[in-house]
């Protein structure tokens, strides 16, 4: 007879084989986390502002305004309203638990995760040509954008060499350091990376300012990490048959 495990949140049991099979296919994790979220927010009541903000965020993200004009979408709208309430409840829960930590985390991450940069890029394998372009740009004979359009080796040439907005965490570390220490509209000395020569000019730096947006983002991230950790612990306990529900 197969060995069974009792599942949290449900008055049922599942065989060890089925449990492992669901986990292997990724289904168990999804189901477990959704049940865990539902359990955590069952007594959470978001305020009207949180509900409306969540609704606006979803409408912007998925262009949901068009659904309001279609009668055959009543079922979708009903389920959408339930999803909005659930997400608003999770947001409230995350703020209640982690808002005191959010600003400190923001300050630690700000420079590399949240500040935004635009820059112009010109690159190719010809060192002599890159240095010639560098002198032309420095002397104002030409500009990096026109030169990039004609001579850059990458897809940036389609946008006159302009790249951004970017966060430093998501780009090459050498380019990130140049952007962090440069001034706007100043061409940097040529550098070699990956067998190509690069000219980089920072165009615009937009420092992030702590706001409700970042507070919500950080708190939700911390809640997701907490839930992920709980899932791993619960699954390990299930596999070891140590749960007593």
Please name every model-derived segment.
Residues 2-245:
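Peptidyl-prolyl cis-trans isomerase
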């Amino acid at each position: 007879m197969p060995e069974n495990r009792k599942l949290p949140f449900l008055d049922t049991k599942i065989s060890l084989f089925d449990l492992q099979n669901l986990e292997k296919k990724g289904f168990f994790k999804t189901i477990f986390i959704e049940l865990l979220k539902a359990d955590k927010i069952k007594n959470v009541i978001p305020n009207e502002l949180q509900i409306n903000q969540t609704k606006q965020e979803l409408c912007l993200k998925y262009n949901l305004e068009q659904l309001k004009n279609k009668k055959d979408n009543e079922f979708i709208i009903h389920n959408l309203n339930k999803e909005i309430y659930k997400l608003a409840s999770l947001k409230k829960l995350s703020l209640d638990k982690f808002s005191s930590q959010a600003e400190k985390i923001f300050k630690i991450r700000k420079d590399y995760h949240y500040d935004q940069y635009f820059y112009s890029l010109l690159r190719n394998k010809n060192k002599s040509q890159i240095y010639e372009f560098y002198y032309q740009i420095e002397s104002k004979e030409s500009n990096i954008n026109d030169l990039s359009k004609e001579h850059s080796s990458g897809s940036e040439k389609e946008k006159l060499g302009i790249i951004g907005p970017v966060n430093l965490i998501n780009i090459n570390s050498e380019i990130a350091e140049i952007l962090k220490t440069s001034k706007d509209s100043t061409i940097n000395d040529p550098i070699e990376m990956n067998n190509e020569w690069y000219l980089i000019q920072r165009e615009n730096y937009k420092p992030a300012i702590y706001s409700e947006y970042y507070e919500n983002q950080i708190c939700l991230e911390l809640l997701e990490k907490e839930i992920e950790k709980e899932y791993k612990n619960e699954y390990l306990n299930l596999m070891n048959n140590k749960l007593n529900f």
